[in-house]
Amino acid sequence: MHKFDLELSRRANPLLFSAERYEEYPLKYDELKQYLLSQNPSHPHHNSRPYTSIDYFDYLLYRSKNDESEIDLDKKLVSEFALYYVQKEHLNSDDLNPTLNELLKLQPKSADWYEMMLRILESINTTGIDQLTKENNNSFPNSKRARSSTNMGGTDKFNKGAYHTDKADDDKNEILQELTSFLMSNSIQKGIDIKPIPLDDPVKFLKNGINSILDTCVSLEKNTSSPPISPNAAAIQEEDSSKKLEELETAFSDLQLAHNFLTKQFENDRAEYVQDIEKLTRTNRELQDKLLNNHSNLSKTEKKLHELEQENKELEKANNKLNSSRHNFGMSSPASSPVTWDPSSPSSVGSPTSGSGSRSLSIMTSEFKKVLTSTQRKYEKELSDEREHRFKLERELALLKNAEANTSLALNRDDPPDML
């Protein structure tokens, strides 16, 4: 038997062998019987448009542009009229077969060129299918197309007796088809292997199928030479089978309950997992924002610390200059000498101008000392403030660095793994 190529059939006739039509094919004996009865013209439930290749061939030729599942009747009528006219002209004219050289010599789109094209189309028109159908009917008298063509032409060529004879033959062929389909479907369902033989003669096929079934039964009887089963044993087997069936039903219901429970648990776990992912994502975003803020604050603090260090250096330079100037002033000033400051010294007493000069000098010295002392205290206070501020900034910088290290460590620990 030749292997059925479904892909080749799908390419040859995509509408007949489409995936949407698979459900229409009969797979069981009852469906096949109903399908065969619907194909019988004498049956009251005859299908007016059976699913055959000729029927779908019309769909391929005259498919409607608006709806591909319907036939464009206007297009089909026009095409059939054109085929009729071509066939009529072909029968009335001489059978001329133009050659390629004759066609190339003609002027394209001229009257002779169009006439030559019509002759070529007439020679390859599809109305010759009727003659081919007649030849196939003579070769395969048991085919469905032969029976239908015979029934269609019976009213014109035969009398009523011949029609009844054809009807009886159709009934006999229908019975043979029914028996054949019953044998094939049951043998497939029960695992009985029927030896392949040519399917041209259905009677031989049925005989071979019956012989295969009998041989299978005989071999089974030989292999299983067990004593006959008593009624009690049959009852026990039936009870065991019913118990097994109940156990299977119980196990099936348990599996359904377990499946439902696991499905709900999976949905709940998935919802919690999604919530955890959202929470971790939100926490990660907040920590990233805090880290950015800490980085910005750290950069500002470092900048301010650098400015304060520059100011501290300038203040130290000014303080050093002030200390050096004060030391030089104490070493070179006459007001600081003991002779000048000692009121009992002879020079201060005996000098005619010593009274007014020493008084003014002492006043200037005291005022200068006051100014110098206030300036020194001011700079010392500013210097101490700058030192305290610097110490405070250094402590904040250390705290920020520790916080940054802890934040990066926490991010590395809390970073969730990538999920699908």
Swiss-Prot record:
Residues 132-153, 325-339 have a biased composition (Polar residues). Changing residue 249 to K: In strain: CLIB 556. The modification Phosphoserine is found at residue 230. GO terms for molecular function: myosin V binding. This is Protein PEA2. Present with 7820 molecules/cell in log phase SD medium. The keyword Phosphoprotein applies. Residues 132-169, 323-363 are annotated as: Disordered. Localized to sites of polarized growth and is required for efficient mating and bipolar budding. It comes from Saccharomyces cerevisiae (strain ATCC 204508 / S288c).
